[in-house]
């Protein structure tokens, strides 16, 4: 080259190397997530409304996932291990799942192709668990946005698992006095020593004979989610902060939903369906469905049997009911047993034997 001549430099190779280097320097999360976070500007790229661009973006991400799978397979071959299955690759990618990088709550996004869409049956169970956790300490969960007004959105199972983990973390870190629904507090004077049979015999002596409105209230708090939340939030069901009551007080004792269900199951073995329908059957039109289990009943007797079933028992096990609440179930179910003879029944049968009703102690 002679003096004064400019040296021609081939920069195409350098540009290719710089471009590939920039792509390699991007965060791992930004390469994997559907909404890519830019490294320097911290701005989220919005998805184009164009269908063609969405398809090309999905194909690009699929190619990246295939490349990552090929790299992992090559690494395993070099190390003498078997190649991972697709399920293992998906489970590994959960570690790269960070919803806080997205610009919208999980349920507002389009599905992530890396995670299979959850089926409706499994989603119902998981969302019910999440709902139960949310209504336990809602004040502590206001900083989390797992709520959405969209009713027709698809989501992955990992989205729900993430928020269940978040909510559980809040509950574990919260002090006991932060739980605003005392009905969900597992340490509220629960009597574990008394058996189901002992409680049934004892409650006949301290619970008033309930009217239809009281029966309606106790049924709703067991088979209706909304009524159960209202029952747990009632002022009368909250522990007093100003005065300490005796732990032996019936009004302060708490029973688990599991215990209530066992009491009902025990009583339903002796209940006559016709007597029960004649006495309280008019309440059936308002209590013909269990929103905990999403089941509709064909009769009042069938509804009561469901309360004593294992299916509902598992759903309401964490709930806490007052003694008088469970005792009300005892009183109105025991009154529908054919073994209980009244004075009128004996007279109608032509017997001259006098029957005395048991003495009932009423406690307000």
Swiss-Prot record:
Which pairs of positions does the record mark as disulfide bonds?
none
Q: What is this protein called?
A: Uncharacterized protein K11H3.4
Name the residue ranges with Acidic residues bias: 1-17
Q: Where is the composition biased (Basic and acidic residues)?
A: 19-31
Looking at the UniProt record for this protein, which Gene Ontology cellular component terms does it annotate, in alphabetical order? early endosome
Cite a single GO BP annotation: endosome to lysosome transport
- Region feature Disordered, mapped onto this chain: 1-61
A molecular function annotated in GO for this UniProt entry is: phosphatidylinositol binding
Q: Which InterPro entries match?
A: PH_domain-containing_F
């Amino acid at each position: 080259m002679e003096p004064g001549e400019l040296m021609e430099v081939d920069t195409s190779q350098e540009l290719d190397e710089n471009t590939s280097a920039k792509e390699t320097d991007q965060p791992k999360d930004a390469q994997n997530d559907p909404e890519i976070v830019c490294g320097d500007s911290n701005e989220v790229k919005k998805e184009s409304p164009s269908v063609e661009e969405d398809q090309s973006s999905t194909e690009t991400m699929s190619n990246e996932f295939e490349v990552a799978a090929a790299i992992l397979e090559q690494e395993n071959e070099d190390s003498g291990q078997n190649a991972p299955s697709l399920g293992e690759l998906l489970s590994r990618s959960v570690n790269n799942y960070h919803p806080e990088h997205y610009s919208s709550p999980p349920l507002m996004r389009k599905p992530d192709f890396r995670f299979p869409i959850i089926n409706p049956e499994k989603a119902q169970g998981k969302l019910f668990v999440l709902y139960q956790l949310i209504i336990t300490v809602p004040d502590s969960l206001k900083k989390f946005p797992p709520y959405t007004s969209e009713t027709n959105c698809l989501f992955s199972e990992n989205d729900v698992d993430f928020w269940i983990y978040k909510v559980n973390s809040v509950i574990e870190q919260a002090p006991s006095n932060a739980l605003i629904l005392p009905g969900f507090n597992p340490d509220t004077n629960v009597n574990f020593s008394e058996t189901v049979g002992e409680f049934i015999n004892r409650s006949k002596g301290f619970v008033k004979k309930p009217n239809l409105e009281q029966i309606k209230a106790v049924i709703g708090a067991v088979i209706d989610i909304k009524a159960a939340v209202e029952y747990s939030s009632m002022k009368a069901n909250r522990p007093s902060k100003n005065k300490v009551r005796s732990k032996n007080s019936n009004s302060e004792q708490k029973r688990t939903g599991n215990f209530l269900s066992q009491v009902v199951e025990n009583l339903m073995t002796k209940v006559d369906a016709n007597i029960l329908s004649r006495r309280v059957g008019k309440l059936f039109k308002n209590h013909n469905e269990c929103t905990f289990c999403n089941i509709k009943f064909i009769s009042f007797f069938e509804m009561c049997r469901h309360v004593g079933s294992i299916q509902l028992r598992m759903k309401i096990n964490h709930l806490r009911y007052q003694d008088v609440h469970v005792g009300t179930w005892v009183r109105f179910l025991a009154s529908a047993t054919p073994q209980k003879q009244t004075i009128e029944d004996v007279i109608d049968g032509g017997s001259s034997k006098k029957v005395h009703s048991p003495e009932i102690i009423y406690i307000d």
